Amino acid sequence: MTDGSAMTLRDEARAKVNLTLRVVGRRPDGYHELESVVAFADCADHLTLQPGAALSLTTIGPGAQDCGDSADNLVLKAARLLGERVPDLTTGAFTLDKHLPVAAGIGGGSADAAAALRLLARANDLAVDDPRLIEAARLTGADVPVCLPSKPCVMTGVGEKLSPLPLPRIPAVMVNPRVPVATKDVFTALGLKPGSLAVGATDVLAAPAWPEAGAPLADWVVALEAGTNDLEPPALKVEPVVGTVLEALRATAGVQLARMSGSGATCFALYADDASARAAADALCAAHPGWWVHAGSLS
């Protein structure tokens, strides 16, 4: 174990984006089985750890007031779960600089928790693939395992099965109308009963033939267009402004694909180049000054 009392460790909690999201069904225990292509954006929260101090969390930044009670934060939950599995775990004082919108379908809280686990792994000389770390991630929340590596993948099961995907860097715009959407409300609106399938008996579940490494961006757009986000219709029932965001994105010049991420309300659009993404973001900011808009890339 490393005595890290004199150093501050830093990590980024990158936003998670579901490029596709298919709800396969609902297990008897109530959890939903999913198939999702996941990428990560170049916008993030920032987390620091001062190892050796008592476990604590201070939240700062433009999104701090939206985080609620620090005692309920997933950063502390993840740290405590790891502490239950690693004897004499060195924890410390976390500071979360919150920039990503909350309850937004981009895994902000899950990304924060995953960053906390990565920082604790560094402070305690643990490998990021240590089974205890992975178990703590799984028990913290369904999106935490995919955020732990924060790399493009196909996510299946209830979020714990990850298959790497050679996704290229994709210019993109992300938009959130600053309206929180509770994941629980969206799944309730979906209305699947425990033990039921969302696919027909003749619908054979198989991994799509995704483009190989080095394939042009256009090939990936075509492959992603064949997918859906099954949570879009119920999210529109819960918060109709999602439809307004999608319409605005689909009306931008040069848009290749626009879709909702996760359970919303954040939506994204893909573009052929950075200039198109930047121009689209500028237009959206001008037309909707109250929205959160980010131009960057997914990878």
UniProtKB/Swiss-Prot annotation:
Keywords: ATP-binding, Isoprene biosynthesis, Kinase, Nucleotide-binding, Transferase
EC assignment: 2.7.1.148
Pathway: Isoprenoid biosynthesis; isopentenyl diphosphate biosynthesis via DXP pathway; isopentenyl diphosphate from 1-deoxy-D-xylulose 5-phosphate: step 3/6
GO molecular function, one term: 4-(cytidine 5'-diphospho)-2-C-methyl-D-erythritol kinase activity
Active site: K16, D143
Residue ranges the record marks as coiled coil: none
Record bears the keyword ATP-binding: yes
InterPro entries attached to this UniProt entry: GHMP_kinase_C_dom, GHMP_kinase_C_sf, GHMP_kinase_N_dom, IspE, Ribosomal_Su5_D2-typ_SF, Ribsml_uS5_D2-typ_fold_subgr
One GO term of the biological process aspect: terpenoid biosynthetic process
Recorded catalytic activity of this chain's protein: 4-CDP-2-C-methyl-D-erythritol + ATP = 4-CDP-2-C-methyl-D-erythritol 2-phosphate + ADP + H(+)
Residues annotated for ATP binding in this entry: P101, V102, A103, A104, G105, I106, G107, G108, G109, S110, A111
Family statement drawn from the similarity comment of this UniProt entry: Belongs to the GHMP kinase family. IspE subfamily.
Biological role: Catalyzes the phosphorylation of the position 2 hydroxy group of 4-diphosphocytidyl-2C-methyl-D-erythritol.
Protein name from the UniProt record: 4-diphosphocytidyl-2-C-methyl-D-erythritol kinase
Record lineage: Bacteria, Pseudomonadati, Pseudomonadota, Alphaproteobacteria, Hyphomicrobiales
